């Protein structure tokens, strides 16, 4: 190295009274360990959440309890299990719909759907049925299968 001179770092500058560090350099002064540490923490949290979801799914399906062959919902397509003769069939209840009417004091109503057959000649009879009814009646022609 011709022409260049090497000056070693000075321990103490007399005018400033500051010392130039000769101590060990810490890797925590860089943002890289924090970046990878945060990334590892997030991936660990995601893995933990997926583990919780998998365990709760297995518990609800009866896999961990050994009830996979004793469940009530048997696969009848396989053919090895006969349908249960003593099973109680559910009672068919009428369907109810929640209709929200905007602008009223109490805007919530329960309605029973009804199919109304409409003819084009009988317009007066249609208005009489709708006035005294609390039921929701579809007005479109597609809902009852007729075309005009």
Curated annotation (Swiss-Prot):
Compositional bias annotation for Polar residues: 138-148
Keyword rRNA processing: no
Compartments reported by the entry: Membrane
Topological domain spans for side Cytoplasmic: 56-148
Superkingdom assignment: Eukaryota
Functional note: Probable subunit of an amino acid transporter involved in the regulation of the amino acid metabolism. Stimulates amino acid export by activating nonselective amino acid facilitators. Acts upstream genes involved in the salicylic acid (SA) pathway and in the geminivirus-host interaction.
More info: Overexpression of GLUTAMINE DUMPER 3 leads to free amino acid levels accumulation, plant size decrease and to an enhanced resistance to geminivirus infection.
Similarity comment text for this entry: Belongs to the GLUTAMINE DUMPER 1 (TC 9.B.60) family.
Entry comment, domain topic: The VIMAG motif is necessary for the function of the protein.
Protein name: Protein GLUTAMINE DUMPER 3
Organism: Arabidopsis thaliana (Mouse-ear cress)
């Amino acid at each position: 190295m011709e022409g260049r001179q090497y000056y070693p770092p000075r321990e103490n500058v007399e005018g400033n009274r500051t010392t130039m560090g000769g101590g060990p350099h810490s890797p925590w002064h860089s943002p890289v360990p924090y970046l990878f540490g945060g990334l590892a923490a997030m991936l660990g949290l995601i893995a933990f959440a997926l583990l919780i979801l998998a365990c709760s799914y297995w518990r609800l399906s009866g896999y961990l309890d050994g009830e996979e062959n004793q469940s009530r919902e048997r696969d009848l397509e396989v053919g090895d299990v006969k349908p249960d003769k003593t099973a109680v069939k559910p009672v068919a209840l009428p369907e109810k719909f929640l209709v929200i009417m905007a602008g009223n004091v109490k805007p919530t109503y329960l309605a029973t759907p009804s199919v109304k057959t409409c003819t084009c000649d009988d317009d007066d009879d249609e208005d009489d049925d709708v006035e005294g009814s609390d039921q929701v009646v579809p007005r479109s022609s597609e809902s009852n299968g007729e075309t005009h």
